[in-house]
């Protein structure tokens, strides 16, 4: 197919005159294979008219000053810490570039730590992993003694493609290697320093009982001895509470693994807003821990009311039903038949429940529902919409609904709007709507007075 150049924006015949490009060099004209005949010296080019530094930035001197400043920083660093100076970086065709020689200070020493607390001898934490090349492959030496800061976590030549290793890359390498060796993720030889009889101080063991699930998992990754203590102590896993930020990451396999540490002695299981947990996982967990007394699944969208009833029926048929408290906030599709069956399985007396239960106040900012709620069942029928949800009371003493002797202000969050901060009902009162579409009553919307010194 022929190409049509009839509308091209440039001339079909190139000029025989030389042209000057931006770096100041002259480029010979194209002569279609003929010998260079040169151009007319009297020709005027647009670049000849323009000034070399139109904005007065003094680019050449500034560029030289920055290069010298980087070299001074490198010299000061080497003199202060006694490090040998890295070779200059070779770029492209092998010409030595002074700018990149100054920048080598940042590339070669960016991931090194001072010798005050994170190095062994004269070697850096990474065991001399950097070879001074900007685009080369960095090699990690094998662990031999104290020179390797990884504590033998890398095997073979430990090659890692890239200019340097970031903190996240180091964690990833350690995680994969320790997983293959069956060790604790993030542990090192400094924790047990070769002693087989390393143990945890009894005081630390008492402190572990006051930690939550996320903190226990963090402690178990410190060293091998703490990992063994946390995993083998069944008393630490009798009450398992999963909320933010673990709720978004925990899977069914992880939950089964955590509950197995209780060895059948778990008494309380609360998983808040865990979107990956299903009915089948909950049934398997309860089947292995039949002594459970409290079950809370608020906000777990993949758990259904039919799954909860199936778990309770199985426990009752086996004669092992000991569940006395259920938290089902956010569970959809609860009908009157479901609610009556729950009342029957939990053996709840409605008259006693109405007299001794504590009032519940609305507080949207509460990230994790409290486990101290002594209600046998957290949901109940809303007096207004007749749906089974969380029903809130009004904390305000001057509420109009309380003065009339009725419970007009007692309902779910959809039927009655409530203050985001204090939880009082907003009925015929002034309120302020926030940018996030939450409401504040007239009292909470007032700015707090500043203390005068």
From Swiss-Prot:
**The UniProt record lists the keyword Signal:** no
Domain annotation F-box: ranges:
34-104
Q: What InterPro entries has UniProt attached to this entry?
A: F-box-like_dom_sf, F-box_dom, F-box_LRR-repeat, LRR_dom_sf
One GO cellular component this record assigns the protein to is:
nucleus
BP-aspect Gene Ontology terms: negative regulation of abscisic acid-activated signaling pathway; protein ubiquitination
Q: Which Gene3D superfamilies match?
A: Ribonuclease Inhibitor
Q: Does the keyword DNA-binding apply?
A: no
Q: State which pathway it belongs to.
A: Protein modification; protein ubiquitination
TM region(s), chain numbering: none
Residue pairs linked by disulfide bridges in the UniProt entry: none
Q: Which SUPFAM superfamilies does the annotation name?
A: F-box domain
List the keywords (alphabetical): Ubl conjugation pathway
Free-text function comment from the UniProt entry? Component of SCF(ASK-cullin-F-box) E3 ubiquitin ligase complexes, which may mediate the ubiquitination and subsequent proteasomal degradation of target proteins.
Assembly: Part of a SCF (ASK-cullin-F-box) protein ligase complex. Interacts with CUL1, SKP1A/ASK1 and SPK1B/ASK2.
Its domain comment says:
The F-box is necessary for the interaction with ASK proteins.
Put simply, this protein is called: F-box protein SKIP14
